[in-house]
Structure formats: C-alpha cells, structure tokens
Regions:
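N-terminal secretory signal peptides
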Residues: 1-9, 19-21
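Extracytoplasmic/periplasmic solute-binding protein
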Residues: 23, 145-162, 166, 190-236, ...
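Hinge/lid segment of periplasmic solute-binding proteins
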Residues: 36-40, 106-165, 302-306
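Conserved C-terminal helix/tail region of periplasmic/extracytoplasmic solute-binding proteins
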Residues: 39-41, 73-74, 176, 392-450
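Short, solvent-exposed loop/beta-turn-alpha elements that line the ligand-binding surface or hinge
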Residues: 39-43, 122-140, 224-247, 294-298, ...
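Extracytoplasmic "Venus flytrap"/periplasmic binding protein-like
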Residues: 64-140, 173, 177-184, 277-281
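C-terminal lobe and pocket-closing loops
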Residues: 126, 287-300, 311-413, 450
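Glycine-centered hinge/linker elements that transmit conformational signals in sensory
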Residues: 192-197, 232-264, 308
Length: 450
C-alpha cells in the first residue's frame, strides 16, 4: 500500500495535469457567452471529462449550443484512455468535487458503483420536471445500460457508446486480388497475411495497444479466460496453455505482419493508419471502423468488414459500454444532469450520425432508423448489422470477467505481460506466469479470498 504522502503527491500531480488539459470551450470556440435573457443555470460552471474517442471529441464542437440553451459554462477535456482512468479513479475515490460529470468506464463500473462514488440517476430520470417524457430513457439499448446498474437495478450511468470489436480490411482489394475473402478464422487470417503483407506498401496487420481490451478476445478464442468463473470465482487463469497460445498468436501477428513499432499504436493511430490505406487488416472497434467510410478516408471503396475471426474454441467479440455519470461529490447535480440529458438527446446524436458518421450509438430508435442504417453501410457492407450481431453474441455472458470490481488490477497485469511478450523481453509462458502471480497478489490486497 502506498504511503499517505506519496498518494497526496500523486493526486496533486494528476490534478495539476488536469488543470493543464482543461480548455474552457468558450475560449476554444472563440465565442462569447450568450447574451440576452437569463438562462436556467446562468453562472454555473461544470468540469467534465471523458477519455478521447469520436463522440466525446465531437461533443466539444457542440458545447456552444449547450451554453446558449442553459447558461452553463463547461470546462471540458478528453485525455487518452489510461490517463483518464487513472485521474477519474483517483478523484472519485476521494468523493471530491473536482468533476461534475465523468465517463463511467466499463472496466470500473463495478468498482465505482459498488464503492458509492457515483450518484444514482433514477430520481432524475423519473422526475418529469427534470426529464421530459420524450427524452425517453427506455430508448437506450438495455444491454448498454445493464453494466451501469448496481445489483438492485439502480442506474448510475447513461451509455454513450457500446464498444464492439470487429474486423476491418481497409485494403480488401489486396486480399481479393490474391484470392482471399474476409478471414473467418485466425488460421485463415495468418495464411492471408503471409501472402499480402507489404503489398502496395501496406503492412498486413495492426491492432491497438490496449492489451487488456484486445487480448481477451484472442484468449477466449483459444478457450482461456481471465478468471476461472467470474463473477463467482475470481481466481486468475493467466498461466494456462491457452493463454500462452493466444498471446503468442497476437504477438506473431504484430511482429511478423505489423508496421514498424506496431506495439505502440493507440486506437487513434490505428484508425488513421487504416483510413490512409497503410494497413491491410485490423481487429478494431466499430466506432473507429465506421470512420473508414467518412470524409478524408482513402479506403472507402476498398474496405470490407466482418466479425472478428474465430479461434479453436470459437468467436468472442469484445463488447463494452461507457456512459456519463455524476460523481457523488458534484456540487450542482441538476446542472450535471442537464449536460447528460443534452449530450445524449436523440436530436444531437442523430445530427452526429448524419454529419460525422458517428457509429456504435446506444439509442434503439436511431440504430433502427433508415438514415443510420444507410450511413453504417460502407462499400456495401452493413457494419451496423455486425455491431448488433456482436452485441447479441455477448449475451452468452463471456464479458462477465470485465465488470468484476477487481478487473482493473488484472487489466494492468495483462497489459504489462503482453508488452513483455510482444517486445521479446520475455516468452509468453514466463510472462504470463508472472502476470498470474502478480494478479493474485493484487487481488488479495484488494480483499479477494481464494
């Protein structure tokens, strides 16, 4: 356990970083606050943060509308995923008032909700004076909302995305020209990559370096899992032959067919490399893959998509929800709810899908609309259907490992273990044995009994 003075120093450093990253949208947009009649929340300022992805970055462009409507000023930032989670977890643990709205990260839902660090949202949803009937909470996909509930069913987050791992071949033309279709299995994928890698200057394979998100899909495809039987039995199972085989496969795909420094690619870098046609094939999130069909993409007419390839034991596409929540220490929760309501209104999300091709939305009425379905068809492939089919597969329950309260500790150990394997620092069996031992120790410190 860290000593108190170390914890304070770390917290101060993170909050200093947070201050440096916060950009009041009125300054960024160059627009002055609205003039004229008094707004409902004039004089209120909200501090809001979310990890960097398509939707939260788009929100920044629309914030002037929110201030015009409500009078609320917003300090808003979107750091990278690891930085955001570290900062949010630390701030929430103090029950402080530094943030008024935060993203409820999927892997932290059990920890943050179970610890009482977030505000229940049911009273806001049920109050007709705060939430009009046409906002329609029931319109959100139930599977996206479920991780945001506690054991009693109370809601602590409103989902803005369901992350779904799919397969994208930005240069499917190279696969087709060499007699290959979209690979259905990992074996088929590797056979194809052996032929097409480096053709027309394109590297064969890439995936983002959040190994705690990417690796479990490969792990389960080989018949392994992170825990023995989550959520009831949390004994880690990272040192199995299946775990080693999955890690060796992922490392080989990156090292044999990836670009230079493949192990360092973030999700944004993967997306841009695909859009530029520098990568032939990737297992990547649907929300990012949807951008292959948007303005600026060089591969709209050469792209193809499918569910992720299956391994010896099947196909297990990663599915995860993220949503807006209100920290228990937020000073003006009514204003916080106004932001959540506005940012997830049907009108705003619909405009984002129509203008920017926003994918992986969470409102049923939009997913089922003709406009959205058409927008999600890229080069003749219905990526929206792949999204829905992947979510349906997750109803088998294989994502349970990800919402137990101690998964963040396992996530950290997986990330370190895969980093050692892919870099060649350690063999898979050796690295995963170390991850197993470290995860058991971390879970014991967190109070898990074996």
């Amino acid at each position: 356990m860290a000593h108190p003075h170390v914890r304070v120093t770390r917290r101060q450093a993170l909050r200093t970083a947070a201050g440096a990253l916060f950009i009041p949208f009125t300054l960024r947009s160059g627009k002055a606050p609205a003039q004229g009649g008094r707004k409902p929340f004039d004089g209120v300022t909200l501090n809001i943060s979310c990890w960097s992805a398509t939707y939260p970055k788009l929100i920044a462009d629309y914030l002037p509308e929110f201030q015009e409507k409500t009078g609320i000023k917003v300090n808003y930032d979107t750091p990278g995923f690891p930085v955001y989670n570290q900062r949010a977890d630390l701030e929430l643990s103090t029950k402080g008032s530094g943030f008024d709205v935060l993203n409820v990260t999927f892997i932290y839902t059990s920890r943050w909700i179970g610890a009482g660090w977030l505000t229940p949202l049911d009273p806001f949803i049920a109050d007709a004076n705060k939430t009009p009937a046409d906002w329609d909470f029931a319109d959100f996909v139930p599977g996206s909302v479920q991780p945001m509930r506690d054991k009693a069913g109370a809601v602590y987050g409103i989902p803005w995305i369901s992350d779904v791992l799919i397969a994208a071949a930005a240069r499917f033309d190279l696969l087709a020209a060499n007699g290959f279709g979209m690979p259905d299995t990992l074996d088929e994928l590797e056979k194809a990559l052996q032929v097409v890698n480096k053709k027309d200057g394109a590297s064969g394979f890439i995936t983002e370096n959040h190994w705690g998100w990417i690796y479990p899909a490969y792990l389960q495809a080989f018949g392994g899992n992170v825990f023995r039987n989550p959520p009831d039995d949390l004994m880690p199972t990272l040192d199995t032959p299946e775990a080693a085989a999955a890690a060796e496969t992922l490392a080989r795909l990156l090292n044999s067919y990836g670009p230079e420094a493949a192990a360092g690619y973030t999700y944004d870098q993967v997306t841009e490399a695909l859009r530029a046609g520098r990568i032939i094939y990737s297992t990547h999130n649907h929300a990012f893959c949807a951008l292959l069909g948007e303005e600026g993409s060089k591969v709209t007419k050469t792209s193809n998509f499918s569910m992720i390839p299956k391994g010896p034991k099947g196909r297990f596409p990663g599915v995860a929800s993220h949503g807006w929540g209100i920290p228990v220490g937020a000073k003006n929760k009514d204003a916080s709810w106004e932001f959540i309501k506005w940012s997830l209104s049907r009108d705003l999300i619909q405009r984002m899908t129509q203008k920017h091709g926003l994918g992986s939305v969470t409102r049923k009425s939009l997913i089922g609309s003709a406009d959205y379905k058409q927008r999600m068809v890229i080069n003749g492939i219905d990526t929206g259907r792949l999204f829905l089919d992947s979510i349906a597969m997750s109803e088998q329950g294989y994502m349970k490992y990800r919402t137990v309260h101690v998964y963040p500790q396992a996530n950290a150990q997986i990330t370190q273990a895969l980093g050692r394997i892919i870099s060649g620092q350690m063999k898979a069996k050796e690295s995963l044995a170390l991850a197993q031992a470290n995860t058991i120790a971390d879970l014991k410190r967190a109070g898990v009994r074996f």
